[in-house]
Amino acid sequence: VNNYNDSQKSKFKGIGFGNNHDNTSSYQLASILKAHKIKVVETDGKKFKYFIPLQQKKSKLIKAMFDSQTKFEDSLFYDVSAWTFPLAFNLNYEFLKEKLSGNELFDKRSGKISGFSSYGYLIKPYDYNIPRFINFLQENGIRLKSSSKIFKIKNNYFDYGTLLIPVVGQSKKPEKIFELLTDISKKTGIDVYSLSSGYEDNIGFGSNSFTTIKKPKIGLIVGNGIRSYDAGEIWHLFDTR
């Protein structure tokens, strides 16, 4: 009750964090908050992806997680004393004096594909799950390319590194490619954009503006001289993420 009363006196209405560039990292932080029974609202994403109202019972915990403390009265402190949750996820955040409207977050966001294409598909390169997305397709024999130019399709901007999955020249049939993309899009929360032609905004999707991504061969060194914690962290990343 005291927490709630204190939150009503605050000049801030809540905290905004996250963006539409990296849905996965934004959601991971939101899911941690939900696990602690903190209310999180999913917004339209124009300014921030999520909004945390401060007028709730755990307002002090919320502030502790988002406060950026740089000065300490004591000369001795643990490294966790300076941890700020959103920075651990490389996310922007801001204490806001106005509320952001939206729906309370309940379930994990599922990625979507804009439709079937006979030409190809595009994926923006920002999301934390992009390596997983690429690996899944390469393990299924799908050839991918990466853009060396910025381009636009119907007011939708695509940055350097945008992924292209051409339909022509693949070992899989177009229907199978669409099925695989639909599957990994749902699992990773990454949106897939379907192409309606092979040429847009002065860029040809069969041109040298796109470079084929080679499947990597990765080795993990373990044993004497290697900290088991470091090796385990990388192993877990590759094995589960």
Where are the regions that the model predicts?
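Intrinsic-disorder/low-complexity accessory segments
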Residues: 1-241
